[in-house]
């Protein structure tokens, strides 16, 4: 049975949610600057939430020629600590460690993956390890962790790949119904830094438009914060 203190906390929490919702109008379209301002003023959680973007694209992701996927280096970073694993031959392990990799190895890491031990956010591999890594493709693939040359995670340039992963590289991929979702920094970032990240991400997705696509490419865009409000972006305000 709840005591008076518990009831007071619930009432206070409910009031904060109502007040937050009142600051964002569901029937209004916002430009990026106003959207960031509104989301900050409407946030009521006690942790530092992530600014999230959802983009609806006019593609059919079931067709291979309409796949939209890539990576973006966010100018202001993500605000998250990224654990990087590097799978390489023994002669390059010291190089990977010196570059800041959190986990370095070869078949030992692959064995850990098979055992369900995945203690990393990004997996980088040298080309000569890809045959061996193929044995865990079904495990890494669904988690978005499979090294891919198109994403810069299968490379001979280990140092630069680690640097990119640690400094705020974000992968994007259109899922079913042409939806792209990504986190683009913490709400505690300055408005300027969040806008830099937003513009860099949006520009990259727009440039990734399939060459043969007919009709409208960018259908809708929404910004939100973790456990917070969501606002729709006025697409005419996107340069």
Curated annotation (Swiss-Prot):
Which UniProt key words apply to this protein?
Repressor, Ribonucleoprotein, Ribosomal protein, RNA-binding, rRNA-binding, Translation regulation, tRNA-binding
* Gene name, Swiss-Prot/TrEMBL: rplA
PANTHER family found in the cross-reference section: 54S RIBOSOMAL PROTEIN L1, MITOCHONDRIAL, LARGE RIBOSOMAL SUBUNIT PROTEIN UL1M
> GO molecular function: any one?
structural constituent of ribosome
Name the coiled-coil region(s). Answer: none
- Name its GO BP terms in alphabetical order: regulation of translation; translation
Pfam families the record matches: Ribosomal_L1
Keyword set includes Ribonucleoprotein: yes
The free-text function statement in the UniProt record for this protein reads:
Binds directly to 23S rRNA. The L1 stalk is quite mobile in the ribosome, and is involved in E site tRNA release.
GO CC entries: large ribosomal subunit
This one is known as Large ribosomal subunit protein uL1
Q: Which family does it belong to?
A: Belongs to the universal ribosomal protein uL1 family.
Highest taxon listed in the record's lineage: Bacteria
* The protein's assembly and partners: Part of the 50S ribosomal subunit.
């Amino acid at each position: 049975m709840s005591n008076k203190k518990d009831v007071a906390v619930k009432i206070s929490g409910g009031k904060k949610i109502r007040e937050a919702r009142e600051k964002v109008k569901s029937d209004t379209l916002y430009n990026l600057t106003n959207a960031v301002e509104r989301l900050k003023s409407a946030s009521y959680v006690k942790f530092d939430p992530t600014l999230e973007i959802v983009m609806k694209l006019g593609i059919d992701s079931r067709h291979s020629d309409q796949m939209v996927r890539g990576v973006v280096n966010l100018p202001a970073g993500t605000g998250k600590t990224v654990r990087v694993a590097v799978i390489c031959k023994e002669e390059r392990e010291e190089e990977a460690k010196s570059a800041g990799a959190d986990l370095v190895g070869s078949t030992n890491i692959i064995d850990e993956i098979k055992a369900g031990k995945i203690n990393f956010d990004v997996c980088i591999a040298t080309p000569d390890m890809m045959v061996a890594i193929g044995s865990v493709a079904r495990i890494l693939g669904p988690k978005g962790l499979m090294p891919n040359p198109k994403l810069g995670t299968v490379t001979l340039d280990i140092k630069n790949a680690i640097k990119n992963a640690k400094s705020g590289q974000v992968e994007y991929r259109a899922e079913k119904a042409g939806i792209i979702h990504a986190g683009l920094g913490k709400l505690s970032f300055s408005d300027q830094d969040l806008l830099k990240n937003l513009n860099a991400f949006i520009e990259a997705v727009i440039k990734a438009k399939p060459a043969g696509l007919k009709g409208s490419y960018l259908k809708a865009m929404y910004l939100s914060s973790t456990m917070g409000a969501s606002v729709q972006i006025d697409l005419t305000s996107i340069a």
